[in-house]
Amino acid sequence: MEEEEVDGIPVNEFGRLEIDFDYGFDFTGIVTPPVSTDYDVTLYAKLGLYCYNFQKGTNLKFVRWEKYNTSTGTAYIDNYITLEAMDPSCNSVFSFQTVFSAAGCYNQDTYHVQDWRVLACRPTCGKSVNEYFDRHEAMDPFYTGKIPKWLSDDALAFDNKKYYVVQESDLHENDWLLVFMEMVFLQENPELKVSPPLEINKVVVETKEDYITEAREKLHAENAIFYISYKYTGVSSSDHKAIIRKTMDGVPEHMSLEIALVK
């Protein structure tokens, strides 16, 4: 088969431009602040940082995004984001880059599921991006089948080693849970331009594996399912539910978040 090209650049089998890391981030259509619709970019950047912190054991904090550009195909939108991150341990600020992808959606029973992926997350460098996410070969089938139904109280009481009910103290220590919640609300309300007033009601984490020492270990599992109920506290306040399946395929800098909105 003859290789396709876009503006003289080869396109690989996944429909993405075969470009090196720096060129991918500065290829075309670069957007810089201030813009009025940057809330989504901020969330994407924070999720890239979360993936890096999770895999590296660091605690980098988001400062601001500097620029981004997008690459689109028939089934995906890749956002190449350059941001400033801070290391609180030494108060140093440095350039960081992440690729955050809207990797497609599907319908399952009453759910509409969107698959979001981090395909790169690291301090700025010139390495290429591995955009192939191998969900089925690298993962236990427990995390690749259908999104489970909303967790009932009976199920939670029946097998409490399988689940962990997140405590208030966990929310303070794991502020990425709030980012997960905001990402859910953004998926439901893609027109959002600023951070909405939201409050978590309850989060339950499920893993196939039992915990070793304490149940809160499930918060730090590579693969896990989160049942999140929360409240929008703005005008016309409302309650919301979502299921998030977080998976990693064993490739550094990769993470998938499948988000199912529960009606």
Q: Which ranges hold each PLM region?
A:
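N- and C-terminal low-complexity/disordered segments
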Residues: 1-263
